Amino acid sequence: MRLLLASASETRLALLRAAGLELDALPARIDEEGVRAALEAEGASPLDVADTLAEMKAQKLAERHREALVLGCDQVLAFRREVWGKAPSPEALRAQLLRLRGETHKLISALVLYEEGRPVWRHAGEVRLTMRECSDGWIDGYIARNWETVRHSVGGYHLEGEGVRLFSAVEGDYFTVLGLPLLPLLNYLGQRGFIPT
């Protein structure tokens, strides 16, 4: 069965291909900010926000590709009682990083698989990240050096790049930080016979 990733994320695609999966990636265009805002207004948890967005992406692509196994993914940042997506500008990222420094936040990464137009599997992983006390100047320099590469990342950092220097502690699965809880996904695909085990 053909595997489709309902995402434009180069990181997710690279992780899946590095794991030996053959797949194609097609972005599923949904109004993420509008959906996130509506869910927050209803009091949805960060996990529910990530799961709903992942499902909407998978569903949208599955409607056009019923023959494929479609993987929808989403990641949100949870800080106190707020749910954050991607910062829309360097200024917004600066404000986020200033609020996060010295604090602990969570990244929640959700996956939903659709088969024959219906959801068949879902998983959400959570990681706790504690940001160190960074100076305003270091944060400004970090954003100036990295904006173009982190602008599409929740939190505005890549743990696999200079963004790792923002943190004093990370508790949880590395793949979940990257937006793809890979091991549970591979386990499911193996159990179902989609990949050899």
From Swiss-Prot:
Its EC number is 3.6.1.9. It is an enzyme of class 3 (hydrolase). It catalyses: a ribonucleoside 5'-triphosphate + H2O = a ribonucleoside 5'-phosphate + diphosphate + H(+); a 2'-deoxyribonucleoside 5'-triphosphate + H2O = a 2'-deoxyribonucleoside 5'-phosphate + diphosphate + H(+). CDD domains: Maf (cd00555). It is found in: Cytoplasm. GO terms for molecular function: nucleoside triphosphate diphosphatase activity. The keyword Chloroplast does not apply. Keywords: Cytoplasm, Hydrolase, Nucleotide metabolism. Belongs to the Maf family. HAMAP family: Maf. PANTHER family: BIFUNCTIONAL DTTP/UTP PYROPHOSPHATASE/METHYLTRANSFERASE PROTEIN-RELATED, BIFUNCTIONAL DTTP_UTP PYROPHOSPHATASE_METHYLTRANSFERASE PROTEIN-RELATED. This is Nucleoside triphosphate pyrophosphatase.
